[in-house]
């Protein structure tokens, strides 16, 4: 009658799914209007010319063109712009 009693239940064993954040279109890459350029939490990068920002801080292209990254101002803000093609 060798039986094993019930083991204790662990309170671990969960994990959340990855959020898939980051740059989706890189410098000099051609994008069409509405394309997502950057998915981010907060404004790590700011919208420049022809770039819009969604309510979750996603940056997207407003026009067709090439993606351009730049740094602006004393605070060193990263800007994402679209140069129309």
UniProtKB/Swiss-Prot annotation:
Keywords: Ribonucleoprotein, Ribosomal protein
Species, as recorded: Methylobacillus flagellatus (strain ATCC 51484 / DSM 6875 / VKM B-1610 / KT)
Keyword check for RNA-binding: no
Pfam families noted in UniProt: Ribosomal_L27
A GO CC term attached to the entry: cytosolic large ribosomal subunit
Organism lineage string: Bacteria, Pseudomonadati, Pseudomonadota, Betaproteobacteria, Nitrosomonadales
GO biological process terms held by the UniProt record: translation
Similarity-based family: Belongs to the bacterial ribosomal protein bL27 family.
SS bonds (residue pairs): none
A molecular function GO annotation: structural constituent of ribosome
Key word Ribosomal protein present: yes
Protein name listed in UniProt: Large ribosomal subunit protein bL27
